[in-house]
Each structure stands twice: as structure tokens, then as C-alpha cells.
Amino acid sequence: MSDKSFLNWPFFEPRHRELSAMLEAWCAANLPVDHTDIDTACKSLVAALGRAGILVHSGADAGETLDVRALCLIRETLARHDGLADFSFAMQGLGMGAVSLFGSAEQRDWLKKTRAGKALSAFALTEPASGSDVANIATSARKDGPDYILNGEKTWISNGGIADIYVVFARSEDAPGAKGLSAFLVPADTPGFMIAERLETIAPHPLARLKFTDMRVPASAMIGEPGAGFRISMSVLDVFRSTVGAAALGFARRALDETIKRATNREIGGKPLADLQMVQGHIADMALDIDAAALLIYRAAWTKDKGAVRISREAAMAKLY
């Protein structure tokens, strides 16, 4: 087990230490999982995370706020044990982030399902031409009576092809740049919705290109107000950017654990590698970088939890480091 002394930092409260202990026990009993069939593995992980009550932290009830420190602790711990487990948790939070922060009572029924692990979610923002440049989204949402008709494409969408519900960002008004964008909650079985292509990466996880062809959704599918899409997307990303750093921190802690184990067990000239001053220096540098990263990550999370409206600077620093 990695060093847990960082939990005594002033960023954390007793509930975070209790959460960390529960997570360690759950991970030891359930991870890693078989990655042979990635789709099946992700679905099984989401169901297991839901049964364990871990997905409760992926979204907030109406009137409550997300505990970003808890999100970071969960992502760090899961990533240290199994990267796919971290992915599965993170996508439930990111996918339903807009609903958690801005959704109507009707839309929040989906949040209950995703937090229970009974439905998978996805965040459909990135496009083939504009990438993640939200201001240049081209997918359109044309008002037609009581409905909106969506046309366009999204790509590199995590959980694409296996998600039950998607948050889709589209241009609903004739306005330039960030203005005129809206967010829609779209079930995967909506007519006109197509998984155009499944995408492969070096580290396998579900990714897809989506295509919308005259896809009709009711006005009640819109999340928040018309034209609020940019603000909604930035609010969601603002929360989850610091958690990206937390996942990387989990990978780094695992690397340090493995390094120390190897240096302790591997002998050269009749002595462990760990006795060599040069090796000790490298391990010390790793530990220093990990603590520096953790301080940046949990500073950002603590700042958000204490009421900051935006943590773009702090989260960007944490993610960069």
C-alpha cells in the first residue's frame, strides 16, 4: 500500500480518510479485472462500483455540491490499482456532470441510474473539425415545434458505443463562437443516433465517433437554459480537470511502489539496489515529484470545495504537473 500520510494534510477531513480506507479495501478485493473484453469489463466495473456505493460520489443530489476532494481520492486510488476502473468511474461523473450541476428533476432520474451503476453515461463534446474547441462546435440543434432536430458528428467520445445516455453539445441558436450553444440529454436508442465508428487506442477503452442525422429530441432534453451550453461545459470541465491530475497521481504512486519493491528485492554485488546512493537519489526525486503533484491537485480540489466559483488556474496547474 502506498504511503497515506498525505491524508493528514489540512486539505482533508475525517470523512476523506474513512473513504480512503474503504476504497483500499474494495480495490484489494476487486481489482484488477480481466481486460480481455474491454466493453464487458467497463460494464462490469460500473455495476460493481455502483453496488459498492462508490458511484454515489460521481454526482451530487439537488441542492448539494460535488465533493471534489472525494472525487480526486477515488480517481487516485482506482488508478493506482487498475486504470480501467478509474476510467469507468470518471466517465460516470463526467458524463452526468452537466445533469448533476444543471439538470431538471426529470433529467436527474438518469443520474440516479448512473450513480447506482445501472446505466453508463458519456460526454459528447469533441468534434472532428474543431476538436475540443467548444466555441467552434458545428453540430446543430434546430428548433422544430416542441422539439429540436440535431445534425452533426462527435469523435473520441469515451464510453461511445456502450453508454446508455449521452450529454450532447450543439449549436441551438444563430450566434457566433461560444454563444448559442446548448446541452442535450440524449438516450442511446434515440432514432437518428448512430455509432459511426469504434476507435482504438494504445491503452484500450471504449471510444467512438458518433453521428446524428435528423435526430429529434424533445425540448425537455435540453439541460439548463438555451444558449447555456458553453457555461455548462466549462463548469463540468472545471470540476473534472483536477481529477485528471489525481488519476495521473495514482499511476505515479503505483510506479513508485513498484520501483521501491524492485530496488529492495533486486541484488547486485550481493547488495540490494536500494543500497546504492544513485538509486536512492532517483527514488527521492520520484517521491518529491509525487508530493508536489499531490499538493497541487488537492489544493485545487480543496479550493473548489470551499466555494470557489472557478478553479481553472489551479486545476490547469494540477493537470499540467
Identify what each model region corresponds to.
Residues 1-80, 102, 117, 143-148, ...:
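Alpha-helical interface subdomain recognition
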Residues 208-235:
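A short, charged helix-loop
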Residues 151-194:
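A short core secondary-structure module
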Residues 120-143:
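A gly/ser-rich beta-alpha-beta helix-loop segment of oxidoreductase catalytic cores
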Residues 80, 155-161, 201-202, 239-243:
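Glycine-rich phosphate/pyrophosphate-binding beta-alpha loops
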Residues 75-79, 170, 186-190, 213-217:
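Short Ser/Thr-interspersed hydrophobic loop/turn segments at strand-loop and sheet-helix junctions
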Residues 83-105, 131-134:
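N-terminal glycine-rich flavin-associated loop
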Residues 136, 189-218:
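Flexible, small-/acidic-enriched active-site or ligand-binding loops
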